[in-house]
A protein has these predicted regions:
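Short, structured patches in soluble enzyme cores that scaffold and shape functional sites
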Residues: 117-124, 137, 153-157
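A short glycine-rich, His/Asp/Glu-containing loop-to-beta-strand
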Residues: 16-70, 140-171
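A short beta-strand-loop-beta hairpin characteristic of the jelly-roll/cupin
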Residues: 64-87, 97-101
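Hydrophobic alpha-helical membrane-insertion signals
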Residues: 1-24
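Long amphipathic alpha-helical segments that form oligomerization/scaffold cores
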Residues: 122-147
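Ligand-binding loop in jelly-roll beta-barrel domains
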Residues: 97-126
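Generic beta-strand structural signal
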Residues: 84, 90, 102, 114-116, ...
């Protein structure tokens, strides 16, 4: 299947949490009506001052967040008693459901911190489910070599290979 690119939208530079610099791609005024995709951010810097303040405790409700760490380290804690640790190539899958307060705090590293976070809106019937949390380590994520690159399957199925992510949205 071939598709044409009809428009290119640049993300906007902004900050979130306690001043973490990031680029918001979905969720900006240019691109904000893509339900179930609520938000898509790229974060990354070589300068610890751009990210070290992290994302102190804050609430979420009614959606899932999927964080993919390309480089760096983040520590997760939440009000449901979950704790996790993200490092190079790992994924954090958090379902906020009826509500959770959590923090994502970076740990200083010698190199660059870089990653992506996607927010997926939960269907109405699932908005009040129990919060859940899952760390997926890089070694648990299968990949497929293609002619022009490599595909990592975090969730769903591609070419007969199933990813370890368990979404509530069907994505």
């Amino acid at each position: 299947m071939n598709r044409n690119i009809t428009r290119i939208v640049d993300g906007i530079q902004t900050s979130d949490g306690a001043g973490v610099k990031l680029k918001r791609i979905i969720g900006s005024p240019e691109l904000n009506l893509l339900d179930p995709f609520l938000l898509f951010d790229e974060f990354g810097s070589d300068n610890p001052e751009d990210y070290i303040a992290g994302f102190p405790p804050h609430p979420h409700r009614g959606f899932e967040t999927i964080t993919y760490m390309l480089n760096g380290k983040f520590r997760h804690k939440d009000s449901a008693g979950n704790e996790g640790f993200l490092s190079d190539g790992s994924v954090q899958w958090m379902t906020a459901g009826r509500g959770v307060i959590h923090s994502e705090m970076p740990e200083k590293t010698d190199g660059k911190v870089r990653g992506f976070q996607l927010w997926l809106n939960l269907p109405k019937k699932l908005k009040m489910i129990e919060p859940s949390y899952n760390d997926i380590q890089s070694g648990e994520i299968p990949s497929i070599e293609l002619e022009n690159g490599k595909v990592k399957i975090i969730s769903g199925k591609f070419n007969g290979v199933k990813g370890p992510g368990i979404p509530h949205t069907g994505m």
